């Protein structure tokens, strides 16, 4: 490929602390009425002083450890100065000169195999407020309202090196990061609620000439799919400009989900535009060896480690292990099921197909469903005893998922118990053979697929309740014996 994208991400992770970064207002403000979770500190009233939230610092250290970062025992807060209606202080408290962590990495499944994406820095900062545009977008709004609830909500910003080589890799990185912060319990990682936000910097290299385009920042990507789509669009836009012998502006662009395009927002700021200087009202953050050791002990088993254990302990293929461990709750559900039904591969197959289908259709997590390990114990018992076929099991599963009823109850209510009566099945096969001598002749002439006709006949006559294995066996016996 002649043109190659060079992508780096700036990701904001909203921390699930009880209170805000520097005051005692609640941090979970997503569903609160506008301007009801504010105080003199987070709205920047004169004389109000910030007090750092210890839980925020602990969450940042946990995340940095999980991302293989170098933790700095000494870090400091700074003021990032800029004017915007949702920033009442006129500055944002961040960490610029001395971040809490640097030099990390995260391994992802890249386009050409396993790949390390380096992390330049991880630092703490507070969130700004939120503008609510009348008309849904800033370009089409007749006026905008300011909601200060989000002011002061704690964030960590994670900045990667430009190691990402495709829009797909950017999406995979984001998905992996969300999985990690959820495992750690430091964030919900819900992009649609703004708990995980991504800005991407993209430039394009012409591999034949070595020429590189200007860097463009892309914002407003509030889903993993939009991260990938926005970067695909921007890559194509830059390539077209380069093919015309032009260069793109160094600017910030926003993803418009309606038109599926990026639109110019403003010129790209330089870091000097923010006039960073040390925050005088907050002392430095000094971490002891004992504190770091204590936090390290709190780290849970992370997705990669859990996937390796699933492969080793349950003899699962790598693909199964990765799918099951992509969500902490799903992995826990699988292990609970294995305790009740010790058939890991069968359970894995059911969870990855039937369960995930139902979850995705409803856009819910496994913890929000009525499904329990006991449902699988009952379902597998029905199949093992020959009372239902796998076809019937899959047929009733949506009702099991929806209602929480036991499979055996549904089977009884709907009269779906499998027919294992050999005599009855034999009579039906004979009836089919009498009515369809041509199919019998075809079978004897070597067209073995003709046997399927007789199996289908029995299934239709019994409304799918005949034991398929037994039916197949009887069909073969009678046809061979003719």
From Swiss-Prot:
Pfam family, one: GatB_N
One GO process term, biological-process aspect: glutaminyl-tRNAGln biosynthesis via transamidation
This protein's record includes keyword Phosphoprotein: no
EC number: 6.3.5.-
Catalytic activity of the protein: L-glutamyl-tRNA(Gln) + L-glutamine + ATP + H2O = L-glutaminyl-tRNA(Gln) + L-glutamate + ADP + phosphate + H(+); L-aspartyl-tRNA(Asn) + L-glutamine + ATP + H2O = L-asparaginyl-tRNA(Asn) + L-glutamate + ADP + phosphate + 2 H(+)
Gene3D superfamilies reported for this sequence: 1.10.10.410, GatB domain, N-terminal subdomain
Molecular-function GO terms, alphabetical: asparaginyl-tRNA synthase (glutamine-hydrolyzing) activity; ATP binding; glutaminyl-tRNA synthase (glutamine-hydrolyzing) activity
InterPro entries: Asn/Gln-tRNA_amidoTrfase_suB/E (IPR017959), Asn/Gln-tRNA_Trfase_suB/E_cat (IPR006075), Asn/Gln_amidotransferase (IPR018027), Asn/Gln_tRNA_amidoTrase-B-like (IPR003789), GatB (IPR004413), GatB_C_1 (IPR042114), GatB_Yqey_C_2 (IPR023168), Gln-tRNA_amidoTrfase_suB_CS (IPR017958)
Domain of life: Bacteria
Keywords: ATP-binding, Ligase, Nucleotide-binding, Protein biosynthesis
Keyword Magnesium attached: no
Record-stated family: Belongs to the GatB/GatE family. GatB subfamily.
Quaternary structure annotation from Swiss-Prot or TrEMBL: Heterotrimer of A, B and C subunits.
Function: Allows the formation of correctly charged Asn-tRNA(Asn) or Gln-tRNA(Gln) through the transamidation of misacylated Asp-tRNA(Asn) or Glu-tRNA(Gln) in organisms which lack either or both of asparaginyl-tRNA or glutaminyl-tRNA synthetases. The reaction takes place in the presence of glutamine and ATP through an activated phospho-Asp-tRNA(Asn) or phospho-Glu-tRNA(Gln).
The protein's name in its UniProt record: Aspartyl/glutamyl-tRNA(Asn/Gln) amidotransferase subunit B
Gene name tied to this protein: gatB
């Amino acid at each position: 490929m002649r043109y190659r994208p060079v992508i780096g991400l700036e990701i904001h992770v909203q921390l699930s602390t009880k209170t805000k970064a520097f005051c005692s207002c609640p941090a979970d403000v997503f569903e609160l009425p506008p301007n009801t979770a504010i105080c003199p500190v987070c709205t920047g009233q004169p004389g109000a002083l910030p007090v750092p939230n210890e839980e925020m610092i602990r969450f940042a250290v946990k995340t940095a450890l999980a991302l293989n970062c170098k933790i700095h025992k000494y870090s400091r807060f700074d003021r990032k100065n800029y004017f915007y209606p949702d920033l009442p202080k006129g500055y944002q408290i961040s960490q610029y000169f001395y971040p809490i962590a640097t030099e990390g990495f995260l391994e992802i499944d890249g386009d050409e195999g396993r790949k390390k994406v380096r992390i330049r820095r991880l630092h703490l900062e507070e969130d700004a407020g939120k503008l609510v545009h009348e008309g849904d977008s800033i370009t089409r709004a007749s006026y905008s309202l300011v909601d200060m609830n989000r002011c002061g909500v704690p964030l960590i910003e994670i900045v990667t090196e430009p190691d990402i080589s495709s829009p797909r890799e950017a999406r995979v990185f984001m998905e992996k990061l969300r999985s990690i912060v959820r495992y750690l319990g430091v964030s919900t990682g819900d992009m649609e609620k703004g708990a995980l936000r991504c800005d991407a910097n993209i430039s394009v290299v012409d591999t034949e000439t070595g020429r590189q385009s200007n860097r463009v920042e892309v914002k407003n990507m509030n889903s993993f799919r939009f991260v990938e789509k926005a970067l695909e669009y921007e890559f194509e836009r830059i390539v077209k400009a380069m093919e015309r012998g032009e260069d793109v502006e160094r600017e910030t662009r926003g993803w418009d989900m309606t038109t599926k395009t990026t639109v110019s927002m403003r010129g790209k700021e330089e870091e000097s535009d923010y006039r960073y200087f040390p925050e005088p009202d907050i002392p430095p953050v000094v971490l002891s060896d004992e504190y770091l050791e204590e936090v390290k002990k709190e780290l849970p088993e992370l997705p990669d480690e859990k996937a390796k254990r699933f492969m080793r302990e349950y003899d699962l293929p790598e693909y199964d292990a990765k799918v099951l461990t992509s969500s902490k709750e799903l992995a826990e559900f699988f292990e609970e099921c294995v305790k009740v039904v010790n058939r890991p591969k069968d359970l894995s197959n059911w969870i990855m197909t039937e369960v995930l289908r139902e979850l995705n259709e409803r856009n819910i997590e496994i913890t929000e469903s009525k499904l329990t390990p006991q449902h699988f114990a009952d379902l597998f018992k029905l199949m093992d005893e020959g009372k239902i076929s796998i076809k019937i099991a899959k047929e009733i599963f949506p009702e099991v998922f929806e209602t929480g009823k036991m499979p055996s109850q549904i089977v009884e209510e709907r009269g779906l118990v499998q027919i294992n009566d050999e005599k009855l099945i034999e009579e039906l096969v004979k009836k089919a053979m009498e009515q369809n001598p041509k199919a019998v002749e075809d079978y004897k002439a070597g067209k073995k697929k003709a046997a399927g006709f007789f199996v289908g006949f029995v299934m239709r006559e019994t409304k799918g309740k005949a034991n398929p294995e037994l039916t197949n066996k009887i069909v073969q016996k009678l046809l061979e014996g003719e």
